[in-house]
């Protein structure tokens, strides 16, 4: 068997038929799998010494979420270094990155593997991988035929990446015009909700607008901020992060605007604030809704006039900073109740973005699970970490109230449990390793705090009740004191004092 002109023409036609890049890539590898009669095919993008799957056929869905580092996958490293067709012998000692990831063949090792590096000029931009359970599957195809396939795929991938670069406005005025692949932001997901969010990020990134990023706790608002900064002309300058909820009122102004020597007790030298550090760059203010009204007024002045004043200094400093703010609160409601300034809200929300909760992202759960499995594999020095079909279904059926952060913790916990019950360096995650309805769900049954131990008097009963209420609020809000205070409808400072009196904190 060999490639006919008709087969090669068919591959080229498929690359033109797709509506978008993703569709074209999927058509390409599906066609290749059929033509080569192999068990699995994948198109990978190369960036920062790792391969990122763009399209797969015949592989488990979570492969799309995995990131294959060269250091962790010697076969892919060999493909990256070769510069030509790579054929791995059936008895190769090098582990295949897809071992255990071919549906229906989870317990078997891949036998035949061919790798085709893809180039744009002299730059490695990706690879095609072809795998089969039959050892001699690819022997009937010559290297020259496989090079033709690689050339077609490389052309399609190069064009797609160049268009992506131009659409994201990464080809800045005054740049050399040299092709430079856009760096990945780890925003993994192909669901309609995530696709829409990525489009909105591309639209706003190239502008200089302030952006308000909303979404539940654990959805990945910081990743959105990083993606906006990375796609902006300010990307060559710093992205400075500040968690407003972690700021004590006494030092919040100094953290934002800096201070001069002697401004207050302990100010032994001049110190720049976050705005100065972010000059000509971007400042990301996480949990912006936790700022006091007094600080909100000072922040508004910076957004209006671009001037800051260090604590203890009469002089003003000019700064050029783009502000990205994030919150899990409904700031419109906060404005109505007087807890957030309406003028600041309107300044920040010129282009609002909303990060969807994980329960609305469908199969993205499996992609993210694959990403976290690969992270655990590298961190723990394991040869492979894979999800069983039952585990995938289990993850898809769960509601994920803690969103992506909860999924990450659940995967890490499951790997540790599975590793403890299985000898060797290969881990297969089963549904029972998660036990999500009981063990991982962050909100305990509502009646749990009612089953209190018998107490001698009213005061002791009241204190026990308060302790349990605070513990539950903290558990439900990822130990975020500000969010827990809101849930309990009390002031965060009062909550800290009460917790200290009840012995819940030092």
Curated annotation (Swiss-Prot):
Lineage: Bacteria, Pseudomonadati, Pseudomonadota, Gammaproteobacteria, Enterobacterales
Domain spans labelled Sigma-54 factor interaction: 187-416
PROSITE patterns, alphabetized: SIGMA54_INTERACT_1, SIGMA54_INTERACT_2, SIGMA54_INTERACT_3, SIGMA54_INTERACT_4
GO molecular function, one term: DNA binding
Pathway connected to this protein: Nitrogen metabolism; nitric oxide reduction
Protein name per Swiss-Prot or TrEMBL: Anaerobic nitric oxide reductase transcription regulator NorR
Positions contributing to ATP binding: 215-222, 278-287
Keywords from the named record: ATP-binding, DNA-binding, Nucleotide-binding, Phosphoprotein, Transcription, Transcription regulation
Keyword Glycoprotein attributed: no
Residues bearing the modification 4-aspartylphosphate: 57
GO biological process, one term: phosphorelay signal transduction system
Listed InterPro entries: AAA+_ATPase, GAF, GAF-like_dom_sf, Homeodomain-like_sf, NorR, P-loop_NTPase, Sigma_54_int, Sigma_54_int_dom_ATP-bd_1
DNA-binding region: 481-500
Species this protein is from: Salmonella dublin (strain CT_02021853)
NCBIfam families for this protein: PRK05022.1 (NF003451)
Reported function: Required for the expression of anaerobic nitric oxide (NO) reductase, acts as a transcriptional activator for at least the norVW operon. Activation also requires sigma-54.
Gene assigned in the entry: norR
């Amino acid at each position: 068997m060999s490639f006919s002109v008709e087969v090669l023409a068919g591959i080229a036609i498929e690359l033109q038929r797709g509506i978008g890049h993703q569709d074209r890539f999927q058509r390409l590898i599906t066609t290749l799998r059929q033509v080569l009669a192999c068990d699995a095919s994948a198109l990978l993008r190369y960036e920062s010494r790792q391969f990122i799957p763009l399209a797969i056929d015949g592989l488990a869905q979570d492969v799309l979420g995995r990131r294959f580092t060269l250091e962790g996958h010697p076969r892919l490293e060999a493909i990256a270094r070769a510069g030509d067709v790579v054929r791995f012998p059936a008895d190769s000692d090098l582990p295949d990155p897809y071992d255990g990831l071919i549906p229906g063949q989870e317990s078997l090792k891949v036998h035949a593997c061919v790798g085709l590096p893809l180039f744009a000029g002299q730059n490695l931009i990706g690879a095609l991988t072809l795998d089969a359970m039959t050892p001699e599957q690819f022997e009937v195809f010559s290297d020259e035929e496989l090079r033709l396939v690689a050339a077609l795929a490389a052309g399609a991938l190069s064009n797609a990446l160049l268009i992506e670069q131009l659409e994201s406005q990464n080809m800045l005025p005054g740049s050399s015009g040299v092709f430079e692949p856009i760096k990945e932001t780890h925003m993994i997901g192909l669901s309609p909700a995530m696709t829409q969010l990525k489009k909105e990020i591309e639209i706003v990134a190239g502008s200089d607008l302030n952006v308000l990023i909303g979404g539940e706790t654990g959805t990945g608002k910081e990743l959105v901020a990083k993606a906006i900064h990375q796609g902006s002309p300010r990307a060559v300058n710093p992205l400075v992060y500040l968690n407003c909820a972690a700021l004590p009122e006494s030092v919040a102004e100094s953290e934002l605007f800096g201070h001069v020597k002697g401004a207050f007790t302990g100010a032994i030298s001049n110190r720049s604030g976050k705005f100065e550090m972010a000059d000509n760059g971007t400042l990301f203010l996480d949990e912006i809704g936790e700022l006091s009204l007094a600080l909100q007024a000072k922040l508004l002045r910076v957004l209006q006039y671009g001037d800051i004043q260090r604590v203890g200094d009469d002089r003003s400093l000019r700064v050029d900073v783009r502000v990205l703010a994030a919150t899990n609160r409904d700031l419109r409601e906060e404005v109505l109740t007087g807890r957030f300034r309406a003028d600041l809200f309107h300044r920040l929300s010129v282009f609002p973005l909303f990060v969807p909760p994980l329960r609305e992202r469908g199969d993205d759960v499996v992609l993210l699970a694959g990403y976290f499995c690969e992270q655990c594999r590298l961190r723990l020095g394991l040869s492979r970490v894979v999800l069983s079909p039952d585990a995938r279904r289990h993850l898809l059926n769960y509601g994920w109230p803690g969103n992506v952060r909860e999924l990450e913790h659940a995967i890490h916990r499951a790997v540790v449990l599975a590793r403890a019950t299985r000898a060797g360096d290969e881990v297969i995650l089963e549904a029972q390793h998660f036990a999500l309805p009981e063990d991982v769900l962050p909100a305990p049954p509502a009646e749990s705090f009612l089953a209190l131990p018998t107490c001698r008097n009213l005061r002791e009963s009241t204190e026990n009740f308060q302790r349990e209420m605070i513990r539950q609020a903290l558990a439900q809000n990822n130990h975020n004191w500000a969010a827990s205070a809101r849930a309990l409808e009390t002031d965060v400072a009062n909550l800290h004092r009460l917790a200290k009196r009840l012995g819940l904190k030092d």
